Amino acid sequence: MYTRIKNKVKQIGKKILGIEQPKEIISEESSGRVKSTVLAKRLLEYDVISFDIFDTLILRTLSKPTDVFMFVGEKLGILNYTTMRRDMEWKLRREKEAKIGSREVTFEEIYEEMEKYCGVDAQKGMEAEFQAELDFCIANPYMKEVFDLLKNYGKTIIIVSDMYFSKQWMEKLLSSCGYEGYDQLFISCEYGFGKRSGKLYQKISEEYLNGRSVIHVGDNPAVDVEMAQKQGWKAEFYQDIHTRGKKYRPSLMSACIGSAYRATVDIKMHSGA
């Protein structure tokens, strides 16, 4: 069942994105983005270019991050898995914040709780969820062009994300989407603090930048723009595709197919590629 649904979602995505057809050119005006070459030229002015991951370098072919959990639940044969998984993560975040003042959690910690309170085998759960991420994550075609242009110019590229996946997990995901050759990867759960508090930017400035100029590219106006600027970084806002496309997308569709449809249309029309 999981495989059938996954393949159906991919089939819809390929048709909408035109992967199996000659590529239609989406104009600068229709996508609302400057050309990738224009953005790359702006970023070339800085010594170090930093990228966010989800909704910036990588896009999910689903309209919400938690929609991945629907497919995990289907694969594991567990009803109401989405609610269970989402609630367990937030329970753990609240408990850690009350105990140590940090909301950062790891993938392994989440599934330790899932096993303890929900009876989900931690190893099987982690494998199923990460495989689902691999199945539904793709490179943002627009940002991939920008990334490759900068890399060809020999620029220093770092990747910075607030995420529960460890560096090892994220390296696999980035590689599966074609991102190789970046200089450093910083993940919040490995430090116990993230971009949201500004502390991860501060840490990178102190231990990695050594006074070099830096600009961060990301989709969250508070986390990727305001907090970066507060720490003395320049920032380039990339509005996420779902915010741009949401008002045009139908909502009266089944959860799985509707999520895939909305996501793939948003990628096609609003990524900038």
How would you name each of these model-derived features?
Residues 85-109:
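N-terminal accessory alpha/beta regions
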Residues 241-273:
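Flexible inter-domain linker/hinge segments
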